[in-house]
Amino acid sequence: MMRLLRNRSTFVVGATLLAFTGMAALAQTVQEDPRGGSGSLPAPPLAEGVQRAIDAPYFDADEKQERRVFHGVWAPRDLSSPALRAKAALDAGVWDDRAFAHDEVPVEDRADAMLQRGELEEAIELLAGASSIRAQRIRAAALEQLGRFEEADAAIDPIANALLRNQTTEAEDLVEGVRAFMIRARLRGEPASNYQEMMSLLARARDELDRLYWPAYLVEAELLYDKDNSREARAAVMQALSMNPRSAAAWELLGQIAVDGFNMDGASQIAAKLDELASDFPNAPELGSPLGAIVTARARLRQNDPDGAAEALDDTLGRFPTYRAGLAMRAAAQAVRYDFAGADERLAQFAALSPGSPLALYEVGRALSEARQYEQSARYLEEAAALQPNWPPPLVERGLLELQAGRDQEALEALTRVAELDPFQVRARNSLALIQELLTYETVESDHFIVRFRPGVDRVMAEEMLAPLEEIHSIVAGALDHEPSRKTTIELMPDHRWFGVRITGMPAIHTIAAATGPVIAMEAPKIGPNHTGEYDWVRVIRHEYVHTVTLSRTKNRIPHWFTEAAAVYLEGAPRDYSTCQLLVSALTTDQLFDMDEINIAFVRPKKPTDRAQAYAQGHWMYEYIVERFGEEAPLKLMDLYADGVREREAMPSVLGIERDEFIRDFTAWAWEDAATWGMATRPSLDALLLEETLRDDAMRMALRESLEAFAVEASMLAGGAGLERRTYSPPLIAPTEPLVDEWLMRHGEHPDLLELSVGFALRETDGEPTLAMTDLLERYANARPVDPAPHRLLAKVYLGAEDPDLRDRAAPHLEYLDVREQTSPTFASALARLYLEERAIELASTKAERATQIAPFDASLRELAARAALLDRDLLRAQRHLAALVELEPDRSIHADRLERVNAMIQEQGG
């Protein structure tokens, strides 16, 4: 009978848990942000002035109709004439609409559509005799795209003359004039001198002539974007969209900004919006938006998905075979496939259409730079700059590329030229300042490293780095069976601001070290304003050096997750508890990333925990690969990546399974591995609590009512009810000490139950551990070996004991804590002092040394390390720490006196 009851109870528990899990999943689904996913992005609210202008009583019906079309709030009946339909089609990005075949459509609109389609010669021919400022601007734009720069510049002369004579009172003419001046700035290399003038013209157009002329805001956004001022560009483009929600050009610029910020969800939504604008156009072919294809392709290239980029572009190019932006991006996709011959063939086809245009070369170089193909990228960017020396973008990309590749002189030349052309370019300006800063730095060298540092106190750390760096090289190069062909440069940046500029060209960044291949930049581990704080730089640089070696071995063609996984794996340190908790949470809630999601999570996380999970899960998968397929498997994968083989093909070749099967097998293994951590234990604590809850009639009824209410709420949310989203927590019985003791009798050393027992014991002592608790704490530490809490408590108990033998027992627990500590010297210094008490001098010196590696500018730790070294009779180590103290505290003469005595002792020993 008891067995029957137990089986029935298990069944009921399982069924109830199924209901709970299903409801939780439903709640998660219905409570997701409606802005997420792959749907299109809603437009900003229509500006109040637009609606008032459309409804103004002094406009007749035809004028109101024209207003609705101009502001993109038309209904299909408003597109009653070819001219109005053509204007709406241009805005929506439907460049091949049938309206453009009608002669009654203004010649400028027909020519503009040709310009967008890439029919440049035809546009120029059509505009023969047209004298409007817009017509002349379109002619100049077509000539520029053809690479006929002198003719393009000459075509702008009439526009400049008209605007200089102040012969226009139309907002459209001023805005078209600015567009023409933007072309001239690219052609002549004078964007700096004209920038303020162009901004003034736009301000006059929108503030004085027509406050609702939305193209003024769009062109302002384009001008700001050219200067790398994405924040203000985004504000301007949103203003334009509030006055014309159907402006495809505005949406496309917003998409470019999203891609630049690696906001791939936003880019996807904007691309969907562009497709929606095109497909919703009356009687338009349902072929999507060419501008949407550009946004999608650029996003996929940034995600190192050239096949996806090519797929996004091919339909558009079938529809518009001479569309220059599409052709340029398609060549870039071919290059990122590492098919350089194919890319060159596409570049030749582009050059046949536009012999002097640098656009395709620039896009190829830019994409390859993003993919860290530095040598090939530099070649294409150099060719682009040669075709149009006055156009800053190729020079900007080249300068930033050379900076990341560690070729300072080449970076200086490119960025200096950019500064001459365009001092308003933010990234280039910051990076040029960085180069000029780096030129003042000093260096120290070893066999495999160059350490570059700002003169002054940073020398203390820089000179000490070489020996640990060579140890790092031995470990990493040995494990990866590869040695880079050149010395790796470690740039010790003096503070967080300079570090941010070093790795991104912008001063805001949230990390402490980064590798770009042959260069590793790190922030000095200091405390104070503009510093991130102290950290275990040896572990951090070991991680970054793995990137340097894997990138070198794979020719910079390794998937993002895989290089991060190798780097964490070769740090050689155990996981911290928070990482274990994060992984187990993802595992038990079916939230582990698939092979596509894990790469994106590094650079554009959707949740605050995504980036940390990507690091942790990648490391876990790397461990699985080594355990199941052997230590050579990761190296074989790297060799295939070096040959240009993509992950989708490489994994089956080496591992014998497809990526989806790999994730399934890894997940099954992960459950087993997590159990060895004392986590993902079965039965779970929730299951035990639920089982106990179901034994109580009143609690069982309350749980049922709660689930029913939650089901109703979830259904209402799914139906669009405006309820506040919340996390569901079932009403379960509270665990008591007798109940936990009973469970421990049934389930042995269950880690969750032991953790509860520790909590009960601490509650009795106001949170202070006692000697009476040590057995329980040791049991919990053994049951859940990844949790540092029992070790902290045991260390505290033993360190507080008067008995020396008990104090000695603190050491293994402090060692456990220290090996996991990354940002504080507390445990290392405590161990050093404890070992000094025990007269374990060599151990004390080792731990004091580790403390100074985490906090190299802490004078008190230097004194501790010098003392331990002297007791260990290691005079050279003592000399080093005393010399550091002289630099750190120059006003304390005692350091110089001690250093002098140690130097004398070394001399006496013949050193």
Task: Report each predicted region and the residues it spans.
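Residue-level detector of the short coil/turn that links helix A to helix B
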Residues: 93, 118, 147, 193, ...
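Single-residue signature of alpha-solenoid repeat helices
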Residues: 98, 123, 152, 198, ...
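Beta/coil-rich, acidic/histidine-enriched accessory regions frequently appended to metallopeptidases
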Residues: 28-69, 73-77, 82-88, 112, ...
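Residue-level recognition of tetratricopeptide repeat
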Residues: 87, 112, 141, 179-186, ...
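Zn2+-dependent metallopeptidase catalytic core
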Residues: 41-82, 90-93, 147, 397, ...
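Juxtacatalytic substrate-recognition/specificity segment
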Residues: 155, 194, 200-205, 235-236, ...
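Amphipathic alpha-helical substructures
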Residues: 341-344, 404, 409-412, 558, ...
